[in-house]
């Protein structure tokens, strides 16, 4: 209830009681403000991801990890890992069942191929579309880019990482590896996560995005 409404609710004879009530409200608000810590993150992506993981209603973290969660570990933002890729659509591909960490087999289709240069080398990654997700409003243009690299099992999660992108209007696509995130399985084994196809292995170190969370 707004403080102005509280003031109107009490009669003059109860003025002292009102002051006490308002004092409690103010002190409580001050206490909460002091306890609330700012969301960590060098970029907007990092701050949004940390905020999502800090929120019990959206976080994949186990209760014991959420209790002391202060933010994910990220590689330092590096513009080297923001690349422009040639986007080749593959409209004749047939849907397939993608393997996951459980017996769940979601239906995907290879939507295209992305070819780009990174640190003086040329790489190609397949990009996919979830055939169930495109039926959800707001995700009609959603594409899924899973990848493996040589930091996996060291600084980053052993099962690889994911990047979310939208279908571009042109035949070019910007890939920001700084926005690479871990599958939920990296935090909690109760989740079912797509296994990164082996053909999406990058034989280089991608020192960008979310790092390994810890032992689970």
What is the meaning of each model-derived region?
Residues 87, 127-131, 149-151, 177-181, ...:
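A mature extracytoplasmic/lumenal domain signature
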């Amino acid at each position: 209830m707004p403080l102005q409404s509280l003031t109107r609710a009490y009669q003059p004879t109860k003025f002292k009681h009102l002051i006490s009530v308002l004092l409690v409200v103010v002190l409580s608000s001050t206490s909460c403000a002091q306890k609330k810590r700012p969301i960590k993150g060098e970029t907007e992506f990092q701050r949004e991801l940390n905020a999502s993981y800090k929120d019990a209603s959206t976080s994949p973290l186990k209760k014991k990890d959420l209790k002391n969660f202060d933010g994910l570990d990220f590689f330092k933002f590096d513009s080297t890992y923001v690349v422009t890729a040639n986007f080749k659509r593959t409209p004749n591909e047939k849907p397939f069942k993608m393997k996951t960490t459980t017996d769940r087999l979601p239906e995907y289709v290879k939507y295209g191929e992305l070819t780009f240069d990174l640190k003086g080398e040329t790489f190609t990654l397949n990009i996919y579309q979830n055939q169930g997700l495109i039926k959800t409003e707001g995700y009609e243009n959603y594409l899924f880019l899973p990848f493996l690299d040589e930091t996996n099992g060291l600084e980053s999660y052993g099962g690889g990482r994911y990047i979310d992108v939208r279908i571009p209007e042109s035949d070019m696509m910007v890939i920001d590896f700084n926005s690479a995130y871990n599958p939920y399985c990296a935090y909690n084994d109760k989740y079912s996560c797509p296994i990164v196809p082996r053909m999406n292995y990058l034989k280089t170190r991608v020192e960008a995005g979310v790092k390994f969370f810890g032992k689970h």
